[in-house]
């Protein structure tokens, strides 16, 4: 039972550790990365405005007028078929017949999924329907529309508003719409025509009864009170033509223009859910919904953002793209980021020195030297000093690696402020890893880094830490240096000197006695050459003669004295 509880505790500990170790990205990080790629931004701060609920503020970027003719939408239907789950009858071992239920799509209901307060410039073209009996989507104020096409429900034609310069720029139903414009030049021209907010206006002659409007991109013309929008050659595939069909069929004007019908071949080829063929009766009038799903395009009507036009809709709408309200900063002062908790202190400039990074206490078993160190406390001081020095060098390398990147984006590292408890807690590395956003006013800021500076510094830090282990265990310099550990006090010096002197005296006495005894016990053997031997023999003979003479002289003198 105890082992089982220990195992459960280990699992909980590992789970908690992994939870702390793995830091999820901020929810806005993927959006910021996508926008930075589209706009070719790197090594900068992207900030997005947040409201009180921390929801991102959206900006609507108007599309060019040519988008109405170059892009085609998708047909959807007011009701969508959904098959119910099949239920098996266990008594008969058979399945019930598949039943279907109907659901109205969000587009068909005319429901918006977002609200917009900012526009990036004006719309080059707005489309208006005044007399629709279906959902009211909202009206874009006329001052934000360079040109307006409104649908005439009496004859089923689009009519251009030729007197936009003389008519009132404000309608009664525009007072509830609050829109503002801004210019973000760093967005324009950076998206390969994905976000092209330059206006392509229609050219008109507003002072004549018979007027003619020409669009330079598509060649569509309006002449007098009639329009060839539905009959112009090669102009029956664009979004504007599909919108005309969406409105025309909603008013039941199928017989107004001869042979043209709402339920033509191009629509009957569409299929419903799960490849089920669409019944023909869906296509007769009010069940068509024009959608721009999965295209990146949206419709803005008033403040509401829509993905499609429901049948019989009314309002004044424009076409464009939906993006977060972003602000770009090349650098951010530390005082601008109000929710930084950590403090970064200045680090001593790095000195380019070469040296070992081994820490002997990590590799030498301290148990082997515990007894000796108890007798001689100073033993091992060199190892400790070297370890402390190497740790200091490693810390200096780490600070130097991060300092270069941080100083490039932080001009005043000494002015970092602490965050209040209500704000998100973060520091510069978490902001750059995009795990938390830095608060600048009411904006959420993330750092966009595509030069891989931070990752390269992290790699260098990893290599520096690995160098602490990749060192030779045998260091001759360290061996000689360890001798210095014995000379940490004069007491040890005197003890070592006396000990060495005593050993020297013992060795000297023993060696001297042994050498003297050897000299006395060994005979003298001389090695002489023949000449030296002859000379020595002559000398010996002379000495014998001399000795004999002296002996005889002595005997003679002795005899004389006796007489």
From Swiss-Prot:
Described function: Endogenous envelope proteins originate from retroviral envelope proteins, which mediate receptor recognition and membrane fusion during early infection. Endogenous envelope proteins may have kept, lost or modified their original function during evolution.
Post-translational modifications reported in the UniProt record: N-glycosylated.
Organism: Homo sapiens
UniProt keyword Phosphoprotein present: no
Positions of glycan attachment: 122, 192
Signal peptide interval: 1-26
Keyword vocabulary terms for this entry: Cell membrane, ERV, Glycoprotein, Membrane, Secreted, Signal, Transmembrane, Transmembrane helix, Transposable element
Gene3D superfamilies: 1.10.287.210
InterPro entries per the UniProt record, alphabetical: TLV/ENV_coat_polyprotein
GO cellular component terms, semicolon-separated: extracellular region; plasma membrane
SUPFAM superfamilies xrefs: Virus ectodomain (SSF58069)
Transmembrane domains' residue ranges: 489-509
Keyword presence, Heme: no
Reported tissue expression: Expressed at high level in the placenta and stem cells (at protein level). Also expressed in the kidney but at a lower level. Endogenous retroviral envelope protein HEMO, secreted form: Present in the blood of pregnant women (at protein level).
UniProt family annotation: Belongs to the gamma type-C retroviral envelope protein family.
Intervals, Cytoplasmic compartment: 510-563
Listed name of the protein: Endogenous retroviral envelope protein HEMO
Residues on Extracellular side: 27-488
Name of the encoding gene: ERVMER34-1
């Amino acid at each position: 039972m105890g082992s089982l509880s220990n195992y459960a505790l280990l699992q909980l500990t590992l789970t908690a550790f992994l939870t702390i170790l793995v830091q999820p990205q901020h929810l806005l990080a993927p959006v910021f990365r996508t926008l930075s790629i589209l706009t070719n931004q790197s090594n900068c701060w992207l900030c997005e405005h947040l409201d009180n609920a921390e929801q991102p503020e959206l900006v609507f970027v108007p599309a060019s007028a040519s988008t109405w003719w170059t892009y085609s939408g998708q047909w959807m239907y007011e009701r969508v078929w959904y098959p119910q789950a099949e239920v098996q009858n266990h008594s008969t071992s058979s399945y019930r017949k598949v039943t279907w239920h109907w659901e109205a799509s969000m587009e068909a209901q005319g429901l918006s999924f977002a609200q917009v307060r900012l526009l990036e410039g004006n719309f080059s073209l707005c489309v208006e329907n005044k007399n629709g009996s279906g959902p009211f989507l909202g009206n874009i104020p006329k001052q934000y529309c360079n040109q307006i096409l409104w649908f005439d429900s009496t004859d089923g034609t689009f009519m251009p508003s030729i007197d936009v310069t003389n008519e009132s720029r404000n309608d009664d139903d525009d007072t509830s719409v609050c829109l503002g414009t801004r210019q973000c030049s760093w967005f324009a021209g950076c998206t390969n025509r994905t976000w092209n907010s330059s206006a392509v206006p229609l050219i008109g002659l507003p002072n004549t009864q018979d007027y003619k409007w020409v669009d330079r991109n598509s060649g569509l013309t309006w002449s007098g009170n009639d329009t060839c929008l539905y009959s112009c050659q090669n102009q029956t595939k664009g979004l504007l033509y599909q919108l005309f069909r969406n409105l025309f069929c909603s008013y039941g004007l199928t017989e107004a223009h001869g042979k043209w019908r709402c339920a033509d071949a191009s629509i009957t080829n569409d299929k419903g859910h799960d490849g089920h063929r669409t019944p023909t009766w869906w296509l007769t009038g009010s069940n068509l919904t024009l959608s721009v799903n999965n295209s990146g395009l949206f419709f803005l009507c008033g403040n509401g953002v829509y993905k499609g036009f429901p049948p019989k809709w009314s309002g004044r709408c424009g076409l464009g793209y939906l993006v977060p309200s972003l602000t770009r900063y090349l650098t951010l002062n530390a005082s601008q980021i109000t929710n930084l908790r950590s403090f970064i202190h200045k680090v001593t400039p790095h000195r380019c020195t070469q040296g070992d990074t081994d820490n002997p206490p990590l590799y030498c078993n301290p148990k082997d030297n515990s007894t000796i160190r108890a007798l001689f406390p100073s033993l091992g001081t060199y190892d400790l000093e070297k370890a402390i020095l190497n740790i200091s060098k490693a810390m200096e390398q780490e600070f130097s690696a991060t300092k270069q990147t941080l100083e490039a984006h932080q001009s005043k590292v000494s002015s970092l402020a602490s965050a209040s408890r209500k704000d998100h807690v973060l520091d510069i590395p978490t902001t750059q890893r995009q795990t938390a956003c830095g608060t600048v006013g009411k904006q959420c800021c993330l750092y966009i880094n595509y030069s891989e500076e931070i990752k390269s510094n992290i790699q260098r830090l990893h290599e520096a830490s690995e160098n602490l282990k990749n060192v030779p265990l045998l260091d001759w310099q360290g061996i000689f240096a360890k001798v210095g550990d014995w000379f940490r006090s004069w007491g040890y010096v005197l003890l070592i000197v006396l000990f060495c002197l005593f050993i020297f005296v013992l060795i000297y006495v023993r060696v001297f006695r042994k050498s003297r005894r050897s000299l006395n016990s060994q005979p003298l053997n001389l090695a002489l050459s023949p000449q030296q031997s002859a000379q020595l023999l002559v000398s010996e003979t002379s000495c014998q003669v001399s000795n004999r003479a002296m002996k005889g002289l002595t005997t003679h003198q002795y005899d004389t004295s006796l007489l």
